[in-house]
Amino acid sequence: VSKNRLLTTCAYCLNGNITYALEGSVFIAGAAIQWLRDGLQLFGSAPESEALALSVKDNGGVYMVPAFTGLGAPYWEPEARGLICGLGRETEKAHIARAALEAQAYQTLDLIGAMCDDSGIAIDTIRIDGGLSRNDFMCSFLSDILNRDVEVPKVNEATAWGAAVLAAIGIGVFEDFEDAKTRWQRQKLFQSSMTVSERDKLCQGWKEAILKVRS
């Protein structure tokens, strides 16, 4: 059971043996990009968010907390609502798009910190999948903020892959998990190149934005 406000969930059951996992629920991730596209019409397609983010040198002091339906783990504040702060006359739509992508890294940082505290395990590499993992800017920024390697698999839908692996083990196609692990293939690797001072400054800005949402 988590002491840092994460969920305890059943990861899988194999041969009657249940393996549990820690789960961190983030309510809004890729949906923040969809909102910028459809709600504010800042760009025409989700992939354009990456080009916009890369068109500016930094976030310009802009932060987005995408708490459109409340804050999930590790805060659990359902009444919280979204925030875009740090806007100035110099702010462009590119800064807002970048802030939305950067928010995914900060939310992940909050969860990874809680998981490391709960488990006592040092996490040096994380693997990500889904739509946002196709965004190289987000993956690179995630690696920078976490100060960890980020791997993107060739099979981009890990949930479906995991279900297929369990089925394959169950019918004998794979001998066991060790056999299944040999079938996993990495498509991309992202490694941090951000300085400690820059990381600390950015993370402090996120913490201040979270405080605004929670106040």
Regions found by a protein language model. Give the residues of each.
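Active-site core segments that coordinate phosphate-bearing ligands/cofactors
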Residues: V1-S215
